[in-house]
């Protein structure tokens, strides 16, 4: 018994013209839930401070490294921001999802990587995971 692949109708036959995709949990797998990973990395206060303070880093008003350095200093942690940054370098592309993106593009849909990422993580995803060229629009 074989499992057939779903057929993606041509974009010309659908009112849908574009598909927006997130990274974490959609195009890539991160394993450990984020709150748990942050708690393991620096403790509960660190996890909460990172979640509470992440908005500026996601908006590009502060780098992730600057946020990490500030939180480590404010909490008096004996951790290095550069070591903590490695937590943001954990993700594995989901090959099934990436194939779906290629299939959508082949069927004529515009694909958009619509994800909130800090600059450091975005660069890592592009350089190490190969996101450049996956979607039609990724900015």
Segments the model singles out, each with a brief description of its role:
Residues 116:
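Cofactor-binding loop segments of dinucleotide-utilizing enzymes, especially the Rossmann-like FAD-
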